[in-house]
Structures are given as C-alpha cells and as structure tokens.
Regions:
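Active-site His/acidic residue clusters
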Residues: 40-43, 173-187
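Structural recognition of the beta-strand scaffold that forms the well-ordered cores
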Residues: 23-26, 84-89, 112-115, 127-130, ...
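Sec/Tat-exported extracytoplasmic proteins
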Residues: 31-33, 70-78, 87-90, 101-104, ...
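Metal-dependent phosphoester-hydrolase catalytic domains
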Residues: 23, 200-214, 221-324
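Bacterial Sec-dependent N-terminal signal peptides
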Residues: 1-21
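N-terminal, active-site-proximal structural segment of metallo-dependent hydrolase catalytic domains
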Residues: 18-103, 114-126, 195-196, 290-303, ...
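Structured beta-strand-rich core segments of catalytic domains in phosphoester-bond hydrolases
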Residues: 29, 85, 91-177
C-alpha cells in the first residue's frame, strides 16, 4: 500500500509539473498555399499551371513538412510534448488550415485554429493553432490594419484570448508586418503603422482588464533594434527572442546573402517575464541545408527562386517555453 501511495504521489506530482508548462511556437511557413484560385486574390503563382507548377503532390508534401516542423518544436531536455500554441504566418485560407490540422501529420494532435481574413493582395494571412486541452479559447478577433498613403493592403493582426490551466487569461497577438520591399527606409512607416495599431489595441485592452498577460509574436520584418520594436518596448513589452540562437549553427530565424537575422520576434508583458524558462530557435538538422555560396548552413526553404527545393520554410521557428 505504501508503494502504491508513493506511486500515485509521484504520478500526481509529475502531472502537476507537466500541466504547468506551456510551449509556444512562431513560424513563417513560406507561402502555404493550396492549389486552387481564390477569387480576387493574386495567388496565380501557386497554381498547378503556374511557372512553379504548384501541384497537389507538392502541396501535401509542404503540409506534412510544416507538420513535421511543429512536432519537432515540442522536444526539449525533459522529453517531448506537442506545442500548445502555434502562430503561423503566410497561410492562404481556411482550407489550408483544415488540411494541416485534420489531414496532415498533425491530424492526431487535435489542434483547433483561428485565423484572419485580411485584404492582403496575395491573400496570405496569419493563423493560430491551439490545443483545446491546455488553452481554452474565450474569444478571437481581428484588428484591422487600414493602409496608409502609398501602403498596399496588408495582413490584419489576430488577437486571441484564452484561459490556460492555471486559470489565468492569456492574450495572444499574432502579426505579419509589411515587407521591406522598396527598401528599409521607404517601407519603415508601413511597419510603424502596424505597430501603432497593435499598441493602440494593447492600450484598449489595458483599459478593460487589470494587468493583462500579453504575448505578441510574428514576422515583424524588422530586427530587435528597429524603430517598430522600440515602440513596442515603450509600451512595456519585453523581447524574449532578442539574440537567441539555435543549437546547430543558426544565429537568426532567417538568412539573407550569408547573413543571419531575426525578423521573427516573441514579446511578452512584464507580468509574464518570470514565467519564461526558455526561448530558442529550432534549427533541427532536417530544417537546414548547406549554404554552398556563403558557407555554413541556411534554412532549407521550399523554393530557391523558381526552383523547387522540397524543403520546409525560408524561416526557422521560434520556440518559447513558459512555466507557471
């Protein structure tokens, strides 16, 4: 009886520890498009008869590779578990998310999802996968980003409110800021515009809630010291991902002309800082390939120019672990 009681005590202690952890992933998927044309969207680049020859076979390979990437993000020194929350950028539509969560390698994970329906010209959006067993959805809403002068329609910001197992409410914001097309200086006001919209939403949230717990993540198309991120810091957000590396040579989430940089970021409010136990780039070896031009390694992307590379993404995922 004593042995049995000891076993149950240890088991309950293990479950208590396991339930008090949260794994969060951010990933730009690099053009996760299906093979069908969406009316009024410029998705012609990813159709079967396009120069990329984006076929059903390539599409399903891509879905399973994204699933493989997400699954790999659940591994750490204490074992493996599926991520609880996954923020995805560059996702085309609901059909893609249905296939990813119900028919790909992730089908047994039982993820639920929410996403934006933006006016982005290419039709790409952001989406949040979540495990209903560790994150109970309260509500999700879209923060509209109305283009300023000379700015093309871009992705809206996704705000998701959910309850975690401790009973705390977590507010998650997911964004994909405008690219640096036209140059960093020219495009900087567009990213500042998105950040100002985010900060305004955070202001409203803080007026409605007492000391809300905030997590902001996504592809900011800016670095940790960029003006748009500086604005976020002024609003009391802490960049947990600044300066993090991978274990296999990655010094950023993205590599351009041989230089590593992190366009992807994860920020938290001050009241979440003590919960953070780890933040890193997942540069598992299967996500990398040799950089034959500049040396070292680089993300094994799906396309090199127009050449199909049968890879994963041009971005590496960020992995954040919280313990509460």
């Amino acid at each position: 009886m004593r042995i049995l009681l000891t076993f149950f005590f240890l088991l309950s202690s293990f479950l208590s520890v396991a339930q008090s952890r949260l794994t969060i992933v951010e990933l730009n998927t690099e053009n996760l498009f299906d093979t069908r044309h969406d009316t009024l969207k410029n998705d012609y680049e990813f159709l079967p008869d396009s120069p990329r020859h984006w076929t059903r076979t390539k599409y399903w390979q891509k879905l399973n590779r994204i699933g493989q990437t997400i699954i790999a993000c659940g591994e750490d020194s204490s074992g493996w578990t599926l991520p609880d929350i996954v923020g995805l950028c560059e996702v085309e539509n609901d059909s893609v998310l249905f296939d990813l969560t119900r028919r790909s390698l992730l089908r047994k994970a039982r993820y639920e999802y929410v996403m934006t329906a933006s006016n982005d010209a290419r039709g790409i959006d952001v989406a949040l996968l979540y495990s209903p067993f560790s994150f109970r959805l309260i509500k999700a809403d879209t923060i509209r980003v109305i283009p300023m002068k000379e700015m093309r329609p871009t992705r809206d910001i996704l705000h998701v409110e959910g309850e975690i197992e401790s009973g705390d409410t977590l507010h998650v914001f997911l964004l994909h800021a405008p690219s640096r097309m036209g140059g960093e200086v020219y495009s900087r006001p567009f990213r500042m515009h998105v950040m100002e919209r985010l900060c305004s939403a955070i202001d409203s949230l803080r007026s409605a809630y007492t000391d809300p717990k905030l997590l902001v993540m996504g592809d900011f198309n800016d670095y940790a010291d960029s003006p748009s991120l500086q604005l976020a810091y002024e609003y009391g957000l802490i960049n947990i991902s600044a300066g993090v590396h991978g274990r296999n040579g990655a010094k950023g989430t993205y590599r351009y002309h041989g230089e590593w940089g992190s366009l992807d970021q994860i920020l938290v409010s001050v009241n979440l800082r003590s919960w953070v136990t780890d933040c890193r780039i997942n540069d598992a070896l299967f996500l990398l390939e040799e950089d034959t031009k500049y040396g070292g390694v680089k993300p094994r992307r799906n396309y090199n120019g127009m050449r199909f590379n049968n890879g994963f993404s041009d971005h590496l995922p960020l992995v954040l672990r919280l313990q509460y």
